[in-house]
Amino acid sequence: MRVLVTGAYGLIGSACLARLHRDRHALVGAGRSISEARRRLPYARWVAADFARLTSAQAWLPLLADIDAVVNCVGVLQDGARDDTWRVHVEATTALFEACARAGIRRVVHVSAIGADHAGPTSFARS
């Protein structure tokens, strides 16, 4: 199976990628900065993706070409100059799910944090 793993060089994403590699899946890893990822995890094909900008299904569709399954491990811990928790955790994820439906991808795994709550005390918890 050809699997897209988002957030693929983070802690959880890289563990998912390694397991899928052991299971002999064809892998596409997506992340913001892929030069180090290519060096550390050479068994995946890498594509650069700024998840805060992938907030429409149309934006995701090119990344989903020829993909059979998606494992979404994207996550940011707090808002900052490069990170927007709401855009990444809510808008981009919603757009990814819509794009998967449009592309006919029925196998989607989404990794989230326990305790997510729209009334939470931090932007991370609220997203």
Task: List the model feature ranges, each with a label.
Residues A37-R45:
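Short, conserved SAM-binding/catalytic segment
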Residues G29-R38, F51-L54:
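N-terminal Rossmann-fold cofactor-binding loop
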Residues T6, A30, C73-V74, V108-I114:
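SDR active-site strand-loop-helix element
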Residues A119-S127:
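Active-site Tyr-X1-5-Lys
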